[in-house]
Amino acid sequence: MNESYQPTLIEQLAQEYWEENETFEVKEDLSREKFYCLSMLPYPSGDLHMGHVRNYTIGDVIARYQIHKGRNVLQPMGWDAFGLPAENAAIQRELPPAEWTRKNIKKMRKQLKQLGFAYDWSREITTCDSTYYRWEQWLFLQLYKKGLAYKKNAIVNWDPVDQTVLANEQIVDGRGWRSGAVVERREISQWFLKITDYSEELLKDLDELKEWPEQVITMQRNWIGQSQGVIINFNFEKGPDKLQVYTTRPDTLMGVTYLAIAPEHPLAKERAKKSKKIAAFLKKCKQTRVAEADIATQEKEGIDSGLFAVHPLSKEKLPIWIANFVLMEYASGVVMAVPAHDERDHEFALKYDLPLKPVIEPADGHDWDYNQAAYTNPGKLINSGSFNDIDSKTAFNVIADYLKNNGAGSRQTHYRLRDWGISRQRYWGTPIPIIYCKTCGTVPVPENQLPVLLPEDIIPTGHGSPLKETASFYKTRCPVCNKPATRETDTMDTFVESSWYYARYSCPDQDKVMLDDRAKYWTPVDQYIGGIEHAVMHLLYARFMHKILRDLGLLNSNEPFIRLLTQGMVLKDGAKMSKSKGNVVTPQSLIKKYGADTVRLFIIFAAPPEQDLEWSDSGVEGAYRFLKKLWGFSYRIKDALLAINQQKERSNYQWEAPEHRQTRQQIHECLQQANIDMERLQFNTVVSAVMKILNILIKLTTDNDAEAHLIREGTGILLRLLSPITPHISHHLWQSLGFGGDILDTPWPRPDPKALQTTELELIVQINGKLRGRIQVPTEASKEIIESTALNQENVQRHLADKKIKKVIVVPKKLINIVV
């Protein structure tokens, strides 16, 4: 053991030891309790950033802690390798995305290994490998057979110059990020997965996720968006056709003054054929972004269709407008407009001089100026004929029943959740295993022809879809009739890859089936770690896919993740680290200067996992100083501990002196609190406990046999508490101080109940209720001894001078009050 702390050397030695001994490679073992710890897999950008380091350090602390607790721990790592960023980077660098991606993976794998994470690298997966996406294609075929994968027209952001679909984040001020062209809304045929078939179960099972953050549960509940409402039929003024409207406020039905339909509604398209003004309006609407948030905040615009519907109760004529704020994807693409009781309808009505008809007044009877603002709360019905004077809640049921009994409507449970559109008009993604034949139509690729390989030598230009221009890919033969046919050139949304990867880690070498029985052993994941930004999309899709895999008999649980931790961001100067802000701190430079253990210790000590972490250079220096202090202390006690650790009776040592028992009690109290905090995932206070223990031990001397044994016990506790957080130095010191074996094979320390037993009490001494001193007495001291000790306390005696004691009151285990 060197006298000075040399992190680079000891970290290299520890990592070589783990690799040579395959320390973290695990096998299924039914005799042991399993623990599956997983951090969200990274996109291989080429460089680890501090957000990665924090995420993976937290996960590693949890995994190593569970190893110490004797569990069979799986902690794998892989790469979310497909997607738009790789394609864009490849366009800029003029090289194939496959080449760029694999180069980045190699670099990032090395960076992760430098941090000493306890990953089972034998299970590594890369989502752009055909051995992985082959099973994703197989899964798509199963969904297609069950009617859960289907194709329909949907609206997308279309760049007319680059001839490609854009994600919302690729649009800057209404223009394509590369071409600068004005982006259009275009309707194209796309593949969808029927997640809505699982809406009710996805909502209901949120109640089972007891160890998920409440914020995530709420976000998913709102995204699924269950509502109870009524479908209402509005017949056309002329002809047998009707428009169906879904509403959660049937109590406002008598206040409807117009209907509004989406620009993509078939009726709007039909009217555009007969009116140039309507056609021009629909064209203008195509230049609106697709995102719901953008539509909600844009200026409300519309045009009269020239058609009328009939109110189902009053039989009044209602004009039908085409409005840019109505979403075709929501319900039926038709809105019943109640301007007096809906802010959006109110804004639109004032703009186009449409009538307002108040039908709800505040329940407390105070006046409301409906011309100034819509009254949107429940209340009492007015101007509603036979429904007058009943409250909104009662009116919901009364009007719903009336509509049902008169064939004008029906109750319906509605979900805001829409089917998952997985088509991407991109190159770098999983090919969708579908063939189009002029004779046979849409034909799924036979399972024995999987995988449909993505050509990896393409250099995308950013114009159009590269697969549509690659004849060697799209030209094929129909598997049914053997005539010339074409492949689907859309690729899958990368969220599909990340919706089932956690299960594939259980059997990445399996080439006969998607998942085998090992998946049932390891799933569900016991602890999942990742950012709150994935609360809805990724986590919802993974929950959906887990239920699909269960229904296919591949898994035997209902949910993928038992416990979820959403870690906070890493900030510098109050802002999230980013290259554009110039506030990035690179992990590699810190590891080179201080070592991985220092980086890990700072990350863990600086803030609780779920809170944002403010970067501090002085905090990193402080972590480094602590590890040097630990090393220096260990070097000083090395010879004494090596000698004690060779003694057979070392574990049965008895401490007699009160001061030694008190010191031991302090150490075990720190351990007791640290164990509570480890279970609560409050790792920063575990570090605080370790620092307290070291400060206690440093004051002891190895020249005293009792204290030397205290140092041995305390150091053994300290190193195990640090082992999940700073594994390299803990591994090295454990062996250098003669504790024997691998520290990871030793059980997690537990406080000794005897050590926690208090032998002395501190009591406060009052004179006429005022604090005058404190005394230490044995726990079982008699009243006489307590009184005598209190009266002989120096400060108490000074205040008693020339005073006559009337009585002494002893409150057991709390205080003594001397009345004078």
Swiss-Prot record:
Binding site for ATP: K579
Catalysed reaction, written as an equation: tRNA(Leu) + L-leucine + ATP = L-leucyl-tRNA(Leu) + AMP + diphosphate
Principal place of residence: cytoplasm
Species in which this protein is naturally found: Coxiella burnetii (strain RSA 331 / Henzerling II)
GO MF entries: aminoacyl-tRNA deacylase activity; ATP binding; leucine-tRNA ligase activity
Gene Ontology BP terms: leucyl-tRNA aminoacylation
Organism ancestry: Bacteria, Pseudomonadati, Pseudomonadota, Gammaproteobacteria, Legionellales
Keywords: Aminoacyl-tRNA synthetase, ATP-binding, Cytoplasm, Ligase, Nucleotide-binding, Protein biosynthesis
Motif 'KMSKS' region location, chain numbering: 576-580
Identification of the protein by name: Leucine--tRNA ligase
CC per GO annotation: cytosol
Record keyword Lipid metabolism present: no
PANTHER family in alphabetical order: LEUCINE--TRNA LIGASE, MITOCHONDRIAL, LEUCYL-TRNA SYNTHETASE
Locations listed in the record: Cytoplasm
